[in-house]
């Protein structure tokens, strides 16, 4: 018996641990009578038959006693079997051979059943089912995006990608022609199409429906608890404790030593005992109980009752007493629709007034209103009025601009309606209702020449070209072109040569205006041409190049605006129909645009394309004046309802800013050709100069700042300043008024 035990200990390491541990679980329940074939090894293990070796006894004892003494054999095998295996390797090899011979010669039903249940250990291995046509391994296929192949096969050859990728048309044709298109997928490892089998399709459908992939799997099998609810006297496992469990741990020793050192150094303090009494946070600890504001901070007083009126008097006036018809109508109304909740009555004296019948009802409704209706505290926003004013720069930082009156040009006997300055800024021309044009020297206020025109001068404009000395004046139904012969004589002579070089065509075309040469007497005064329209002319303005001029006529229809060409002496009407009464026109300084201001709108026309580009809405009752910024992207309009409107053509067709600084109607507006200034003249006798900076950055809005109010004109016939114009080079402004004077502010 001892020999068999020793042999069993020696042979224990040669047996696979997995199989020995799994045999008690896979072994069926013990039967009352074991088979006869399994009893022969037991007799050999007792030593009755001397023909059986010790190795055979150890093998059979290990197979048979695995259910009872498995733990003891394992422990003993762990301690003693290692030395035996190291000392005598040949002996263990003989024991393995003997064990195989004994198992083959003496089959045991228990052993056969266990081996049949264990089976092949690779039966559950699914690695053989993997597709190994592409042998690149478990690497990302994105590594092969820049290569013509996707991997390598078993022979090491490259697996090339398809020559042409399928587009949507190929997919559509496959969907229509291939009956197995719906069960075809693309293999990412090889790039080829795979057709799913019926079993794979059924598996996909089961997974999509939320079922298990295995058909024979039952997720609702009855569960068998390994541990029963009955208390047993024997433990589940009787394995003795390890030897290392009786030896103190060195790691714990180091931890304890560190904790002891921390306690000595005072780094670890014992926990303070908690106070078992509950602590509550005092909400009103910071409140002063004696402060009236603290106690009544959130108090909202109840709304007061309305005071009684005359209808509630015991002796009301007769007009408050209802007639019989009014009383019947009051009784037929709903209680909520009645203006009065009672009928006014009249009593001879106060002591004759009976008790009020609705007193209790009204007190009850008052109590309901007090405790059911929520009260709301309206927070008043205290806004400083200074914060509402936009932060603008100081006017002294925006200089230069005109600040005071420098000169007064006197000579006209009636109101001066229009002004114009020569391109060089040396001469000034003014038109008046006294029927004369006066030419002034700007620096000295001396009247150089007076030209009688025989009518009211509505508008005057100096040619902006420095190579031409020509003045256009609108007098009644004609436009007079005069050569003042001021300044350079060569320029004046070249102007006469330019006008006299015109050769009229043999067949003059039909035009809306007539071009007439001046007589000898008129030429001595300076008149060169006369353009007759047949209708009163209200405005004349030059194009920037000096060859075209636009005229506004006081008539109805599409001929309100005419454009004249000086070099060819031609006139034309640019519009086919009218859009209201035209007030002012202006040429764009840089583009072929014509701005036409009617009473309620400003239209921007493209002359080359002959189309409407934009329509500006000033939101004014009556537009009176118009001016275009020298850059051409901004427009200002004045109106008779004392508004000045600034338009940004790149921003919107609505006003960018509306200024209401004047108290009466605006008569004229003007931009300075060089400085960021614009001015407006009004019937209140003042000229307001504003700083208008336009930035090159389109994301930055223009800066508009009023800088100066200039006064000096005397109101005459309820008229003040009639025209305003800037000096072309200096920050000066000219103004003409109804008092018959022209004033220069510098």
Swiss-Prot record:
Q: Where is the composition biased (Acidic residues)?
A: 66-87
What is one process in the GO biological process aspect for this record? ribosome biogenesis
* This protein's UniProt keywords: Nucleus, Phosphoprotein, Repeat, Ribosome biogenesis, rRNA processing, WD repeat
Could you tell me which residues carry Phosphotyrosine? 122
Write down what this protein is called.
Ribosome biogenesis protein BOP1
Q: Which GO terms describe its molecular function?
A: ribonucleoprotein complex binding; RNA binding
Q: How does it assemble?
A: Component of the PeBoW complex, composed of BOP1, PES1 and WDR12. The complex is held together by BOP1, which interacts with PES1 via its N-terminal domain and with WDR12 via a high-affinity interaction between the seven-bladed beta-propeller domains of the 2 proteins. The NOP7 complex associates with the 66S pre-ribosome. The PeBoW complex associates with DDX27, BOP1 interacts directly with DDX27.
Give the Basic and acidic residues compositional bias ranges.
Answer: 88-99
Primary site of residence: nucleus
| Top-level taxon of origin | Eukaryota
Q: Which SUPFAM superfamilies match?
A: WD40 repeat-like (SSF50978)
InterPro entries xref list? BOP1/Erb1, BOP1_N_dom, WD40/YVTN_repeat-like_dom_sf, WD40_repeat_CS, WD40_repeat_dom_sf, WD40_rpt
Enumerate composition-biased segments (Low complexity). 43-65
């Amino acid at each position: 018996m001892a020999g068999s035990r020793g042999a069993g200990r020696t042979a224990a390491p040669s047996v696979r641990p997995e199989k020995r541990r799994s045999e008690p679980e896979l072994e069926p329940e013990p039967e009352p009578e074991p088979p006869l074939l399994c009893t022969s090894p037991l007799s050999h293990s007792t030593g009755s038959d001397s023909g059986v070796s010790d190795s055979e006894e150890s093998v059979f004892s290990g197979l048979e006693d695995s259910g009872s003494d498995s733990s003891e054999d394992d422990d003993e095998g762990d301690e003693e079997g290692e030395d035996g295996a190291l000392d005598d390797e040949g002996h263990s090899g003989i024991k393995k051979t003997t064990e195989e011979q004994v198992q083959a010669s003496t089959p045991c039903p228990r052993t056969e059943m266990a081996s049949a249940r264990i089976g092949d250990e690779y039966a559950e291995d699914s690695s053989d089912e993997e597709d190994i046509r592409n042998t690149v391994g478990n690497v990302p296929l994105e590594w092969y995006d820049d290569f013509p192949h996707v991997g390598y096969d078993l022979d090491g050859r490259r697996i090339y990608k398809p020559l042409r990728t399928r587009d949507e048309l190929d997919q559509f044709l496959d969907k229509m022609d291939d009956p197995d298109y719906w069960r075809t997928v693309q293999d990412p490892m090889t790039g080829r199409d795979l057709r799913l089998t019926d079993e794979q399709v059924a598996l996909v459908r089961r997974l999509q429906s939320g079922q298990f992939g295995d058909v024979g799997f039952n997720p609702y099998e009855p569960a068998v608890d390994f541990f029963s609810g009955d208390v047993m006297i024997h433990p589940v496992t009787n394995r003795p404790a390890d030897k290392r469990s009786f030896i103190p741990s060195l790691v714990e020793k180091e931890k304890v030593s560190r904790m002891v050192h921390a306690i000595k150094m005072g780094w670890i303090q014992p926990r303070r005992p908690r106070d078992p009494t509950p602590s509550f946070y005092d909400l009103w600890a910071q409140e002063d109980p004696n402060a009236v504001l603290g106690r009544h901070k959130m108090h909202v007083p109840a709304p007061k009752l309305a005071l009684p009126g005359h209808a509630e008097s015991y002796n009301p006036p007769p007009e408050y007493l209802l007639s019989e018809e009014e009383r019947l109508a009051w009784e037929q109304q709903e209680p909520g629709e009645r203006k009065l909740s009672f009928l006014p009555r009249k009593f001879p004296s106060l002591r004759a007034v009976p008790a009020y019948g609705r007193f209790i009802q009204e007190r009850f409704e008052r109590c309901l209103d007090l405790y059911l209706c929520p009260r709301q505290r309206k927070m008043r926003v205290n806004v400083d009025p200074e914060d509402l004013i936009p932060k603008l720069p100081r006017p002294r930082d925006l200089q230069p601009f005109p600040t005071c009156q420098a000169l007064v040009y006197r000579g006209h006997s009636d109101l001066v309606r229009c002004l114009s300055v020569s391109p060089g800024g040396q001469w000034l021309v003014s038109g008046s209702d006294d029927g004369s044009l006066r030419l002034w020297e700007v620096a000295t206020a001396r009247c150089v020449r007076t030209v009688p025109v025989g009518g009211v001068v509505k508008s005057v404009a100096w040619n902006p070209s420095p190579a031409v000395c020509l003045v256009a004046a609108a007098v009644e139904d004609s436009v007079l072109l005069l050569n003042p012969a001021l300044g350079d004589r060569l320029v004046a002579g070249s102007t006469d040569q330019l006008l006299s070089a015109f050769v009229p065509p043999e067949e003059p075309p039909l035009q809306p205006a007539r071009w007439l040469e001046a007589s000898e007497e008129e030429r001595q005064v300076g008149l060169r041409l006369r353009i007759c329209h047949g209708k009163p002319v209200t405005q004349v303005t030059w194009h920037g190049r000096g060859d075209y001029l636009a005229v506004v006529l006081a008539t109805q229809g599409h001929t309100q605006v005419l454009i004249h060409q000086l070099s060819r002496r031609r006139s034309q009407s640019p519009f086919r129909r009218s859009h209201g009464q035209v007030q002012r026109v202006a040429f764009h300084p840089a583009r072929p645009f014509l701005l036409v201001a009617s009473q309620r709108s400003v239209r921007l026309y493209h002359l080359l394309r002959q189309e409407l580009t934009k329509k500006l809405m000033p939101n004014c009752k009556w537009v009176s004046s118009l001016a275009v910024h020298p850059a051409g992207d901004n427009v200002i309009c004045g109106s008779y309802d004392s508004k000045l409107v600034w338009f940004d053509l790149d921003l919107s067709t609505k006003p960018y800013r509306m200024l209401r600084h004047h108290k009466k109607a605006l008569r004229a507006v003007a931009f300075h050709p060089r400085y960021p200034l614009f001015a407006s003249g009004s019937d209140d006798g003042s000229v307001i100069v504003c700083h208008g900076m336009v930035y090159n950055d389109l994301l930055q809005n223009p800066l508009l700042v009023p800088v100066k109010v200039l006064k000096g004109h005397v109101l005459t016939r309820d008229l003040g300043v009639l025209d305003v114009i800037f000096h072309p080079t200096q920050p000066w402004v000219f103004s003409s008024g109804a008092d018959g004077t022209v004033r220069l502010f510098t």
